[in-house]
Amino acid sequence: MLNISHPRTRVFYGKRQKKMITEHFKPPFVAKIPRGSAMGRGVYLIRNQGELNDYLSLTDVAYIQEYLPVDRDIRVVVIGRRVVHAYWRIAPQNEFRSNLAQGGSLCLDAVPQEALELALNTALSCRWDDVGIDICRHAGRYYVFEANMKYGKEGFRQAGINYSQLMETMIQNEDI
């Protein structure tokens, strides 16, 4: 997929295809509701057939992703062809999601350049000009988990960045 490093991901449609999920993914794996899974809602860690059945009862389309066991990820916001903010999101204990809305915490420590470059290259390759990209480091590599066109602004607030002013300045400078 555009040479973007990402966890193995597959979409399954219909009853016949859904029956093939466990042929392609062994638990644990991540299952997402394809639309509307914002702020960590609609994202499930599937550990057994019962949890898979519960998930499948919620959606006609199964969006399945390889589970990478990490305790934190990086949110990189790209606007107008440049990285404007990046921060760590740390998952609460016994939770695989690091979303702030799911109890995750925000850390403003420096983000590795390799992660910033992956996010920027992903945004440019996909022609996204206002996106929050979630990245993790696993087994020595960086992976893009997902991209969010409607990303939270709490990271800006905690960093003391006025998001509205940032957008206004970028518009005035014709950066976007």
Tell what function each PLM region has.
Residues 1-71, 113, 117, 173:
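Active-site nucleotide/adenylate-binding loops and adjacent lid/helix of ATP-dependent enzymes
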Residues 128-139:
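A short glycine-rich, hydrophobically flanked beta-strand micro-motif that places a catalytic Asp/Glu
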Residues 41-126:
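Phosphate-binding site of ATP-dependent enzymes
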Residues 110, 137-176:
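C-terminal active-site "lid" helix and adjoining low-complexity regulatory extension at the edge
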Residues 29, 82-85, 131, 143-145:
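Protein kinase-like catalytic core scaffold
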Residues 26, 80-81, 139:
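Residue-level signal for tight coil/turn positions that link beta-strands
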Residues 34, 67-68, 77, 134-136, ...:
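Anionic group-transfer/hydrolysis microenvironments
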